Amino acid sequence: RNAFRGDGKIFYKRKLPDDSMDIAIAILNDESGSMSSKQRITYARSASIILYDFCRSLNIPIAVYGHTECYDVDLFAYAEFDSVDGNDKFRMMDMSARDGNRDGAALRFVAERLMTRPEPCKLLFIISDGQPAGSGGYFGTAAEADLRGIKAEYERKGITLFAAAIGDDKPNIKRIYGDGFIDISDLSKLPTTLGKILIAKINQKYAA
């Protein structure tokens, strides 16, 4: 089968296995207000749709979520693993820059959803432009420590986390996510970069 480029076209040809991939994917999008800058939310939306299409074409279970916070954490389920109504991509078009971002609660929710999948390889992609900034003092070192703890907890449970940093807050995101940090300086390369990571994981699985 063919893998995709950032514009949705094929970026290289590679024969991929036709049987079950034993991989499940979840994407968590930051929908904080700062995502309106430099069309970040547009690129995040595009990357989510392209990855969604690619996974569906290979029968890889995928779920896509967004999150923000305005007093309470708001989570948006754009595509669920078992979604059958055919409207996932229409829902993803509603992805928007909104308010704050209390990342810990959202990340834990999506990780728990991913844990319900039977596939042994579980990948969670986070697309964000900055460090957490929520109400009730959820920011700075305390929030960073919370996220590092959540990352470590779910990696022990078998989830591999990647954080695509698409804003100016890259050092902080790298400090939080460590080896899962992905530096996206060119927003147009976001879909391609995430796609290549997914392809590498597929190839790694079948080379084992």
Give the predicted meaning of each segment.
Residues 1-208:
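Acidic, glycine-rich A-domain
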